[in-house]
Amino acid sequence: MRHLRYIHDKNYSGFCIRKNSTALMKSGGLFSSAVDMYRKVDPGIKIKLKDQKIVFSSGATVSFSHYENDKAADLYHGLEMSGIFYDESSQASESHIWWLISRLRTKAKMSPSIWLSCNPDPSSFLRSWVDWWLYPETHPKFGLPDPEKNGKIRYILRKNGELFWGDTREELIEKFGNPR
C-alpha cells in the first residue's frame, strides 16, 4: 500500500520481497493482491508477469522478487531501489536486510526507505530492533507494544556491526559523527 504514495513519480522503483517467490506469485499472494489494489487506483497499469512487475501510467514501477539465500543478493546488485517492502521479514537473515538497505537510493522525489512486516518471533534478529517500542521486562505487560510509543520514529546507526539507536538523527551524529 505504501508504494501508492509515489506512483505519480516516473522515477519511483518500488520492490516487494519475500524469502521465496512462490508465496509472492501464487493466487491470493502478494502479487495478485497488489494488482487488484493498484488497478483500482490506476486502471492503466501494465502487468509484466514474466518480470513480476507492475508499471503505472506515470512509469513508476513496483517489482516483486525473492531473497531466498546469499546468492540472491546478485538480483539486487547495482540497483537503485526507491522503496522496499519485505513481507514476513522475520524469515530473512539480518545480513539480507542490510544488503537491501545498502541499495536504497533513488532519483524519485522521496526519501528512500525500507519497511518490514513480521509476526512476533522472540528469536528473530528483529526483536532487538523493536525492543524500544515494547514494554520492558519489569512491566506486567512485558513484550507487548507500548501504546505511548506508537508512531514514534527512531534512528539507527550501524557501526562495525553494532547497532546504535537515537531519538533524532542529530543525536546519533553528535555521538558518532556524520557518516558521510
Where are these regions (language model features)?
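Phosphate/NTP-binding elements of NTP-utilizing enzymes
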Residues: M1-R180
